[in-house]
């Protein structure tokens, strides 16, 4: 039931949805409220002389450095890593999972990331290995200084979040750091530690940018990917955390004005929030929040055309409306604000091969007592 209470969201995206999250209106600010100074295990320890302390058994340092340098010089170690994995049975456990620390190159690049001269290359190489090793996220989180190094990469670019100041190289470097954060955010053993450390708050200055330059689009898209990894597995703890931030208004603004790919990830995050009972209750708690969401969804529908295939956007839009209709008061209002293009046959041909979306749209119209043809 909607109430007349004032919204408790901030207006980070230009929508009146209340406050409670960190201030994201000044991307150049180096201070992120609510973020603890210690972001992971061992952050306040002294750096050991022999290299970073890693989770589990570490390979021989000499072999690690030698192999890492050789592969770095070759510039293409993907095939070599795969061959090494196949030829070394010790790298595979009884269940067939490959351990990251059994690969000496992982150790080498983590050493480089924490205090070596090849940090930029380390970000790239470790990002390439995230699909190869299931436990890379645990290694990244548990290894001395790694999370601090990743956060330093992110914080260092805050003063550059202005047009003409953010270079392609710097944007790519930060995106590579964000890819590793996404790896940590998506792993079941590190996801909640990632949240407890409030690390997602460090991404909000990137989400709060509005420039359409490619460098900024990449930052927004990769930052959205980290949030998307958090919400992917329907954890109420994640949703509850995000609802205390400005993520909803930021996603709404991106859905209004960013690239189609960024819009798709942003609406995916919104859909995941709505699918959670806490998220649905939150959005439907006030008229301001409800209309902030439905107005953006309506504008997105109006900009979709049959000549330009809407891709996954239409699919997510329909599912957001369908979930909103589960709230009785929202259902009554949806009968008034649902776009005409979803009531008629505008997207019939577009949805012809999408059985799931057709079914969701039919269910939505039936729920709203609409006639379907």
From Swiss-Prot:
What remark does the entry add? Present with 18800 molecules/cell in log phase SD medium.
- Taxonomic lineage of the native organism: Eukaryota, Fungi, Dikarya, Ascomycota, Saccharomycotina
- InterPro entries per the UniProt record, alphabetical: ARM-like, ARM-type_fold, CNOT9
Localization annotation: Cytoplasm; Nucleus
Q: Partners and quaternary state?
A: Subunit of the 1.0 MDa CCR4-NOT core complex that contains CCR4, CAF1, NOT1, NOT2, NOT3, NOT4, NOT5, CAF40 and CAF130. In the complex interacts with NOT1. The core complex probably is part of a less characterized 1.9 MDa CCR4-NOT complex.
The record's comment on protein family reads:
Belongs to the CNOT9 family.
Write out the biased-composition intervals (Low complexity): 50-88
- Name of the featured protein: Protein CAF40
Give the signal peptide, or none: none
Region (Disordered) residue spans: 1-91
Q: Which GO terms describe its cellular component?
A: CCR4-NOT core complex; nucleus; P-body
Keywords assigned by UniProt? Answer: Activator, Cytoplasm, Nucleus, Repressor, Transcription, Transcription regulation
Looking up SUPFAM superfamilies in the UniProt record yields: ARM repeat
Intrachain S-S bonds: none
Biased composition, class Gly residues, residue ranges: 11-22
